[in-house]
Amino acid sequence: MTWAGLLIALVGALGYALGAALQQYEAVAEGASLKLVRRPRWWIGGAIGFAGACLHAVALSLAPLVVVQPISVATLVFAVPLAAFMYGRKPYRAEILGSLAVAVGLLWLMLLVPEHNVTPHLGNGAALGLLAVIGVIVLVTQVAAGRMSGAGRAIVLAIGAGVVTASVSTFVRVVGGGLEGDWGRLVHWFTLAVPVLLVCAVVLLQRSYAVGYFGIAYAGVQVIDPITSVLAGALLLGEPLPTAPGTAVPALLAAALTIGGTITLGRLAPDHTRPVVPANPAAPIEATAGSGSTVTAASDAS
């Protein structure tokens, strides 16, 4: 069942990448506001992304969290070119190299985590503790983003979106993996938490996309989501982490590759769908000369 889960996760992740590219294009055009609900392309992107998320949920019910999560990382190399295509341009070399570095580094890092396929169990106290920690992280990132701009703002908002997305994956893993043929187990507040957290994740994602730095925003979510999921799986669900001494050097190299790719993406210029208006545009003024003749001059910003 693990291989079936991996294949389903791959298809779902590709759909999620396409949906993200479509929604980011609209979020840059309209901003992270209610205006987005009037944009058909934003809804199409949302539907495709939702289908991808549903497939991801199915995959989580068939395979461990630490096995499924790394699959979504590889879609970064597809999402960035798709976003570039939306703006009618070819992807920059730095975008491709940065995306590959992040994807390879994070996938390498995740593959160091040993496989452990057992029925997940999460107590109410631990679940509430997880939500409290996620809430604090989101609050801190939102406050910090309000004082930042550019790539820094995009990555900080992506961190908040990533941890919420990871919480969705954790609850889906617990609900789906714990069914064991008993559908009555769906009657639990964990099941209700999934759509609520999913809506929060979507809102936070749109805020991150709206900054215009799709590469760094998407990469940020792709990095934070699986790392947070693996930590949650290890701390709350009893899933193992790599402890062998031989994994230390590979883990450091993988982390360096991931960080280097993220920095590369952060240095790229943002994409815009609206022309940039100069800060002090020259506005014509009218001056009367002689008997009613009009002379037009450019205003002096100084």
Mark where each language-model region is.
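Polytopic alpha-helical membrane proteins, predominantly small-molecule transporters/carriers
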Residues: M1-S302
